[in-house]
Amino acid sequence: MARVKRGVTAHAKHKKVLDQAAGFRGRRKNTIRTAKAAVDRSKQYAYRDRKNRKRSFRALWIQRINAAVREQGLTYGRFIDGLAKAGIEIDRKVLSDIAIHEPEAFAALVASAKKALEYLKNTSMPNAFEGAVR
């Protein structure tokens, strides 16, 4: 059986790691041991931050919606509750985009949410806690 020399494989693996470490500072970009550790850590950060990006964008959309809704005299929580009661299913990303680019359409959504909240307030639905608390 022929002898297998691993120089080509090792060189290819090292080259792959060093290519991923391009742009790093100091010895992390050209020393295989430090580059490998830095690349591993960067992949961990990338994995974690792909999850965090979703949270960050949702928080941004909520802040934008809240700011736009407060101009209309409502809070974010009441607005979302009103939309649910009105049967309007629009996600927060689209609501945020509508609030920024189409204020008239957003005002109509706020009006329908207010109307749904007022309608439910005026109906005589028995409170579940009335009999329990004395």
UniProtKB/Swiss-Prot annotation:
Matches recorded under InterPro entries: Ribosomal_bL20 (IPR005813), RIBOSOMAL_L20_CS (IPR049946), Ribosomal_protein_bL20_C (IPR035566)
Keyword Transferase: no
Functional description taken from the UniProt entry: Binds directly to 23S ribosomal RNA and is necessary for the in vitro assembly process of the 50S ribosomal subunit. It is not involved in the protein synthesizing functions of that subunit.
Keyword NAD listed: no
Keyword terms: Ribonucleoprotein, Ribosomal protein, RNA-binding, rRNA-binding
Organism: Brucella canis (strain ATCC 23365 / NCTC 10854 / RM-666)
PROSITE patterns per UniProt: RIBOSOMAL_L20
Record-stated family: Belongs to the bacterial ribosomal protein bL20 family.
GO molecular function: rRNA binding; structural constituent of ribosome
GO cellular component, one term: ribonucleoprotein complex
Protein name: Large ribosomal subunit protein bL20
PANTHER family assigned to the protein according to its UniProt record, in alphabetical order: 39S RIBOSOMAL PROTEIN L20
UniProt xrefs under Gene3D superfamilies: 6.10.160.10, Ribosomal protein L20
GO biological process: ribosomal large subunit assembly; translation
